[in-house]
Amino acid sequence: MGMRMMFVVFLLVVLASTVVSSTSGRRAFHGRNAAAKASGLVSLTDRRPECCSDPRCNSSHPELCGGRR
C-alpha cells in the first residue's frame, strides 16, 4: 500500500470512530431523559389521590386519573 492509501484508510477509521461515539452518546442521553420521566411518573403515581382531587394537578396529569374530568 502506498502512503496515500494508508492515509485514506486512517482518515476513514477516524471518521467512523467519531460517528459511532457521537451517536452512542446521544442514545445514552435519551435513555437518561426517559429514565427521569419514568421516575417522575412513578412519584406522581404515589400521590395519585392528592393529584386527582386537585384540579390543577388533574389537568396537568390526566393519565393518572383516567382522563380529563
UniProtKB/Swiss-Prot annotation:
UniProt region (Ser-Xaa-Pro motif, crucial for potent interaction with nAChR), positions on chain: 53-55
One Gene Ontology term of the molecular function aspect: toxin activity
Disulphide bridges: C51-C57, C52-C65
Main subcellular location of this protein, as a coarse class: secreted
Positions of modified residues (Glycine amide): G66
A single cellular component GO annotation: extracellular region
Superkingdom of this protein's organism: Eukaryota
Record localization: Secreted
InterPro entries found in the cross-reference section: Conotoxin_a-typ, Conotoxin_a-typ_CS
A Pfam cross-reference name: Toxin_8
Signal peptide span: 1-21
Keywords attached to this entry: Acetylcholine receptor inhibiting toxin, Amidation, Disulfide bond, Ion channel impairing toxin, Neurotoxin, Postsynaptic neurotoxin, Secreted, Signal, Toxin
Expressed in which tissues: Expressed by the venom duct.
Family that this chain belongs to: Belongs to the conotoxin A superfamily.
Function: Alpha-conotoxins act on postsynaptic membranes, they bind to the nicotinic acetylcholine receptors (nAChR) and thus inhibit them.
Comment on protein domains: The cysteine framework is I (CC-C-C). Alpha4/7 pattern.
Name this protein carries in UniProt: Alpha-conotoxin-like Tx1
